[in-house]
Amino acid sequence: GKTFHEGDWLSIDGSTGKIYDGAIPTVDASIGGEFGRVMGWADQYRRLKVRTNADTPHDAAQARKFGAEGIGLCRTEHMFFEGDRIAAIREMICSDTVEQREAALAILEPMQQSDFEGIYEAMEGCPVTIRFLDPPLHEFVPTEEADIEKLASDMGKTVAEIKNIIAGLHEFNPMMGHRGCRLAVTYPEIAAMQTRAVIK
């Protein structure tokens, strides 16, 4: 056998489970051949429509390519983990006032709007079901010391203050806790921003 280390490339055949050393050339999946023919027959008689889970314009375009007839669930929280967005959502979470939260959300709104526009374009008029921010806020706050220090510095707070905020977000059962519509009740400015981004 061989020992792999962090940063080493390996490839896995999803059908057989076989592992290959290094990055091997791949081809994009397609619906063709005998499978495509059988699916075409099924399309002639089916009444059920197939929708996809897609959270980005790229995922939506891929889903349409494979025949999805809409998006059954677009999870907006996945949009917040990319690039500069996570910094803005963390600032929003650690803000002391509605005005500070709205300032952070103003950074996120055009990004969300752009994502929704891309998704709508990719879906070519097919229905899209969008779920507003759902997970508990503790999922967005930093856990690494360096990230906590950076957030404290960016917000003009002490590390202790940020750690207190993070500790305050901990829940015994986050699956049943402060999330989803409960978040919208506590922080209506989040739902307002997302509503504007969806509609614009």
What are these regions (language model features)?
Residues 31-34, 41-200:
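Conserved alpha/beta-domain cores
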Residues 20-37:
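Short, compositionally biased
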Residues 1-2:
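Conformationally flexible catalytic loops at phosphate/diphosphate-handling active centers
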